[in-house]
Amino acid sequence: MENEALKNILTRHSVREFTAEAVKKDDLLTILRAGMSAPSAVNRQPWSFVAITNREILDALCEKLPFAKMLSKAGAAIVVCGLPDKAKIFNLAVKVVARISLGDFWITDCSAASENILLASHALGYGAVWTAVFPDEKKIKDVREILKIPEDIIPLNVIPIGVPVNKNEPPKDKFKEKNIHWEN
C-alpha cells in the first residue's frame, strides 16, 4: 500500500507486551502533538494529558488498574483526561439554540485524541493499547489519587506505550462488509 496514512491505520493493533525500553521524550511530544491535533466539537479541545515515564508511577497505576498490567513493562504512558467544564461553556449556548444537550462531547473529543495517540505511537514504531478508566468510579478515583488530578478533570483512559516484544505481529483484518449499510 502506497498511502502511508492508510497503511498506518490498517496495520495498527493493540500491543500488550513491551520490552521495558524507554520511550524517547521527543517521541512522546510528537505523540502528544498528534493527540492534540484531533477534531473536537466547535474546537473546544476539552482535554488534558498526563505523560508518564516515571517507573514508580507506572507501577502504581499497574497495581490499581486490573486491565493495565502491561504498564509493568511499558516505557511510558499517556493518560487522556476530559475537561467537561470546558465543553459546557459551549453546551449552554447550543442548548438554548438547538434544545439539545451536548454535555458529554468531551468523551467523543478525548476518544478522537486517544485514537490519534495510538496511531502516532504506531507510526513511530511503538506499540500502545487503550485501557479504560472512565466510567468506572473506582478507577477514576485511583488514577486521580496517584496522579493528583483535580476533581473537575476526568481521566478517560491510560494508554501504555512502549517498544513491542513482537514487532512483526500482523494486525487482524477487522473489515466486515456485513457491517456496511448503503442508503438504498
How would you label these PLM feature ranges?
Residues 1-184:
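Acidic, surface-exposed loops and disordered segments
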